[in-house]
Amino acid sequence: MKVKPSVKRICAKCRVIRRHGKIRVICEDPRHKQRQG
């Protein structure tokens, strides 16, 4: 899980979603997981 000030999709399978007021990226590749911090 990377915590970044701005989250972006890295590949075509990345999905940007909003959970509990936090913006997250979920993907099949575990290295692409991010959340906004």
Curated annotation (Swiss-Prot):
UniProt keyword list: Ribonucleoprotein, Ribosomal protein
Domain of life: Bacteria
Keyword 4Fe-4S: no
NCBIfam families the UniProt entry points to: rpmJ_bact (TIGR01022)
One of the GO biological process terms: translation
Keyword Chaperone on entry: no
Alphabetized InterPro entries for the sequence: Ribosomal_bL36 (IPR000473), Ribosomal_bL36_sp (IPR035977)
Gene that specifies this protein: rpmJ
Pfam families hit by this protein: Ribosomal_L36
Name of the protein in question: Large ribosomal subunit protein bL36
Molecular function (Gene Ontology), one example: structural constituent of ribosome
GO CC field: cytoplasm; ribonucleoprotein complex; ribosome
Stated family: Belongs to the bacterial ribosomal protein bL36 family.
